[in-house]
Amino acid sequence: MEAGPSGAAAGAYLPPLQQVFQAPRRPGIGTVGKPIKLLANYFEVDIPKIDVYHYEVDIKPDKCPRRVNREVVEYMVQHFKPQIFGDRKPVYDGKKNIYTVTALPIGNERVDFEVTIPGEGKDRIFKVSIKWLAIVSWRMLHEALVSGQIPVPLESVQALDVAMRHLASMRYTPVGRSFFSPPEGYYHPLGGGREVWFGFHQSVRPAMWKMMLNIDVSATAFYKAQPVIEFMCEVLDIRNIDEQPKPLTDSQRVRFTKEIKGLKVEVTHCGQMKRKYRVCNVTRRPASHQTFPLQLESGQTVECTVAQYFKQKYNLQLKYPHLPCLQVGQEQKHTYLPLEVCNIVAGQRCIKKLTDNQTSTMIKATARSAPDRQEEISRLMKNASYNLDPYIQEFGIKVKDDMTEVTGRVLPAPILQYGGRNRAIATPNQGVWDMRGKQFYNGIEIKVWAIACFAPQKQCREEVLKNFTDQLRKISKDAGMPIQGQPCFCKYAQGADSVEPMFRHLKNTYSGLQLIIVILPGKTPVYAEVKRVGDTLLGMATQCVQVKNVVKTSPQTLSNLCLKINVKLGGINNILVPHQRSAVFQQPVIFLGADVTHPPAGDGKKPSITAVVGSMDAHPSRYCATVRVQRPRQEIIEDLSYMVRELLIQFYKSTRFKPTRIIFYRDGVPEGQLPQILHYELLAIRDACIKLEKDYQPGITYIVVQKRHHTRLFCADKNERIGKSGNIPAGTTVDTNITHPFEFDFYLCSHAGIQGTSRPSHYYVLWDDNRFTADELQILTYQLCHTYVRCTRSVSIPAPAYYARLVAFRARYHLVDKEHDSGEGSHISGQSNGRDPQALAKAVQVHQDTLRTMYFA
């Protein structure tokens, strides 16, 4: 979700800012690591030191889409040239703001206009008023960037942004900060009536000493402009409409409704008058039976079917009277349209969740190796020719054509300590290391374990199971996590309904049962049920395995299973070699990771989920989780104070120490809301400490982790590129040139890019009682990226932030209502929510016995 520079998303509750916490200044720049020459997809913007005039515009009717508003303003500027606008080229943001280079001759008065736009069928009339608002100083912006002594004036950045986007907003379809245009010369269908559109992202950002234009290629899913009949066939997998001589079944209608609800359609039965409507529902009855009250000329009202009406009024004999109608406009108005007279309107972005297949098609269509993406961005820049844009020229702005050169540093990777007799160490190379010949730092001995196979017996025979367990035991023994003897129980089962009775039987029959290995037949509701029963109901450790990995075992897959199992049972896979850890470890320190995940768009009833995890030892290796539900789309973690308090108590129970420092990595914060969220959450963390002990005031460092940005880094020297995808090396850090003019932020690409172009994570320090130097925090963050237990690779964000994401993701499965849902995003929207807030809160609460384990690994 992208909020504008001016702030919050609509509808989010944010507390007023009583005291504003100032983000810390950059404590100098980092020096550790091997220098590397990079190119960033940032282009220098040169702005004149002038005043820009800011006007407020008000358009009635006021709920028009921005596209219409832009048209209205464009007409107004052309039409009132002689009286008001002269040769000026105003720029407009599509909502309330207009900027000009010289003042309009209206003084401080409000001026009203009437603007007529020729429409299809009839003209549309708009009332527009303009009033002077303020002078925006670009000289101040210059001063802020160069001196670093005054805050960056956001209104100046906003004016620049509007000027830079004005032309593109008229030419293309804007989405957030990106622009898209219909496919030309390529076609990437996604299925289900959706297709890929390519476009570009553009934003202006304050950087060291200058403004920068961030340009990136981007892609998103749009609905294909096509007849609704064809859309329905795609959604329901009907190859040919003539194969559907019968009315839709209930389940077909429900699936179709879910996809088309909320989309705009245009009608084809009125000649040139292609009126557009928004779909609010799909009728249960076919067009031949769906009736509505028709008023006759005599004034009498009769019930008439949609099919009859179209025959009488338009002389149109429906070809598919057995198919339902679309209900459009307002529900209470009963406007019905047969599917066959409707087309899906072009240029509608798909905000609903993509299916797994669509997602993988999308990735295949959009993944570009780093050198290819670099080439594409450069080509995009040339084609955009910003310096020829009349609006940009009007404001005296100049844009450099070449990517910005930056010197980054490749940080040294930490050494990892394993256990066993030989206490081997592993040295990561390009973000990867090997566990062969090494044993877990602390391996668990598994004595009592069970197998539940939910794959059919013909797919997974007993000898296949036997081979799998033999191979798993061999690998686990090598890894120092011996699985002793045969399973105490090994049975086949079917369907989610058999999970709970089976698990209860296991819990009651086998005392000391440590683990249930569950074999799944592909994508199935059984997974959600296994996790609900295991994590929340009975407190039993479960490890799911796909049947394909049982039938065909590979050492890699089995080894990865062991990484997860050992941790779930309380083991430690490896630790950072103690002597190379940062000075912050000299006193007790807790690492917290926090995330908020929202339900997919269009799913208004499901709650948002917040998760906070905390480290429970000094390595840091073991973590404990807390999770809550809250109002949908709420960005602040409302219950943070209680969650942190729980974790501090757990830390004390685990270590017998009170942390003197709290390092908080916060994922998933929209840029426009940083100040409000920091304000609320920093006070919540302090509050948690004071509630435990009146004078307990550990130093807090609050770091926002952002992955959803468009900064990309490329090797300037071809010889430094890594692997097939030609990416920058793992450990590449940048904290100059493209970062904030004076606040404490940096980019760190901590993982090795395998596919596509690596996305460095952006770290923004919003509060720092602990006075970290740039080197200390960058190295600490990089080291934490090596402590993620599920793989022997460095990951793209620090382990605590990653775990918080996993915990929130797991809670989505705990919320699955097994009557309706599969938890896979393909269900009827809005169950698990006929339940009240208390029931939802209870559904995500993890069982006492699971609470202290890393069940989410």
From Swiss-Prot:
Q: Does the keyword Repressor apply?
A: yes
Where is the Piwi domain positioned along the sequence?
515-816
Subcellular localization, as worded in the UniProt entry: Cytoplasm, P-body
The main place the protein resides is cytoplasm
Effect noted on mutating residue 324 to L: In NEDLBAS; uncertain significance
Consequence of mutating residue 751 to L?
In NEDLBAS; uncertain significance
Leftover remarks: Lacks RNA cleavage activity due to the absence of the conserved His at position 805, but also because it binds the RNA in a subtly different manner that precludes efficient cleavage.
Q: Know the name of this protein?
A: Protein argonaute-1
